[in-house]
């Protein structure tokens, strides 16, 4: 039996041509694996058949939408994950899931290697290969686009020469990646960071400058997990889908950013993530109601580290697992409802409530019924500021001693 390689297959130009390139370069049979993470577009059966028509000996399709939402999006939401405070890890979350299925299918079918269609300039090559190395160190990773210096022009020529069933042209300069958590667009005229994005660039969101009647939604969380919209319970996947539609209609979740890639360069990216940005805003607001101050402060540092690890392709690392444990414990009381108004590109919180709330009305009110004993504040302030007072006295004494030992020269 010939050796096999399992290719992460998207149905696009690079991975369709990659089937033939892999066969020619390695002599191995190519198994195509297409993973549905909610990217939409073509039917997965059409993609499966295209892989076979392009020369794959077998094509496997995995519906991983619910798995993606439950096991990748939900942890990211609990972590309020935003790389460099802006990017909700659209691609960074899907790559370890795809890599997991690459490793699984490779072992099930007796393949000794896996492959992907990433270039040598991006983050995804690292994410795929680091994940495979962590899950299946016996497998080798092949990157034909990177390792064989295969350009888009060469891919188009190859596709035409071999009559591959794909329609591609040089007129589409963008590189696009999308899943149910968001959509990423790069290259083309966006490579000049002075060029503003045009409206035709967007797919998940409507123009936020075209005002529509506001939409009000109430999102319910249980232990950090979104479980309902307006009192109707849904799966995490369905909640993301519903909010993509509702928030996207108001242009919420558009992000235009220059970010630092893992490989050492800066890259201009445009993202659309209506559900992601709405849910993160709601989740953060509920945490402000239910998490004590010190835990919240510390968690913000953990959130940054968590997002960096995932962005850098270390989903399966020991540190990531340890941070997961901390974040999971922090969510025990993050249950309740957040009411939001969606309009004009913004998701604005207008109400919050929780049976686990740390907000005590009787302590917070300035009206009759106030139970806060203000007489205790004077002593609290005295003790709280005592270290600063002692330090200031010390500094003043040292300064005075220095002046006494070395007085300023008398003026002539």
UniProtKB/Swiss-Prot annotation:
Name of this chain's protein: Argininosuccinate synthase
Q: Which GO terms describe its biological process?
A: argininosuccinate metabolic process; L-arginine biosynthetic process; urea cycle
Q: In which broad location class does this protein mainly occur, judging by the first location in its UniProt entry?
A: cytoplasm
Q: How would you summarize the oligomeric state and partners of this protein?
A: Homotetramer.
What reaction does this catalyse? L-citrulline + L-aspartate + ATP = 2-(N(omega)-L-arginino)succinate + AMP + diphosphate + H(+)
Gene name for this UniProt entry: argG
Q: Could you confirm whether the keyword Ligase appears in this record?
A: yes
UniProt-annotated location(s): Cytoplasm
What EC number(s) does the entry state?
6.3.4.5
- Listed binding positions for ATP are 8-16, 117
For this protein, the record's PANTHER family field holds:
ARGININOSUCCINATE SYNTHASE
One GO term in the molecular function aspect is: ATP binding
